[in-house]
Design a protein with these regions (language model features):
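Short beta-strand His + acidic residue motifs that chelate non-heme Fe in jelly-roll/DSBH
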Residues: 60-62, 80-81, 97, 102-108
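Structural motif
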Residues: 77-79, 86, 102, 112
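A cytosolic small-molecule/anion-sensing beta-strand core signal
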Residues: 74-75, 90-91, 109
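Conserved short histidine dyad/triad with adjacent acidic residue
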Residues: 33-35, 48-65, 99
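Short acidic-glycine-tyrosine-enriched beta hairpin
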Residues: 84-99
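Short, conserved beta-strand element in jelly-roll/cupin
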Residues: 53-55, 64-79
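Ligand-binding loop in jelly-roll beta-barrel domains
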Residues: 99-123
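A short, N-terminal "cap"/entry segment at the start of jelly-roll beta-barrel domains
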Residues: 1-46, 81
């Protein structure tokens, strides 16, 4: 998937080779300027999956989401700051955040991770 492509629809099933996409993203201007960038892999009304890449030492400032979210570290090591403390999320680990939870994300080392969010609508 290139930067100009739309996110995939899961109608027929979607699969992604994450490493080359992340490598491509590290060449983007946003990555060079802010230390991180994101790309939508899937954008549906009930599910969004984003791939994010971060330079070591970069931070995504404190924020919250309307939806329950999961963070799966594909490579590297993330440190997530929550109101209750700090959670380390190294490669291969999954962190689930309840909706509305204020948090920030720091890349302890160069990292890539998948952010998945469900619908903010209650069933």
């Amino acid at each position: 998937m290139t930067p100009m492509q739309e996110p995939h629809s899961p109608v027929q099933g979607s699969h992604f080779d994450i490493a080359p996409i992340a490598a491509e993203m590290r060449g983007e201007a946003g990555y060079e300027h802010s230390g991180h960038t994101a790309r939508a892999l899937v954008r549906e009304s009930d599910l969004r999956v984003m791939l994010l890449v971060m330079k070591a030492g970069s931070v995504i400032k404190e924020h919250s989401a309307k939806e329950t979210a999961s963070v799966y570290t594909v490579s590297g090591h993330l440190r997530v700051r929550l109101p209750t403390g700090v959670v380390d999320v190294p490669s291969g680990r999954l962190l689930v955040l309840e909706r509305g939870l204020v948090h920030s994300v720091e890349a302890v080392e160069e990292s890539s991770f998948l952010l998945s969010r469900g619908s903010h609508e209650k069933p």
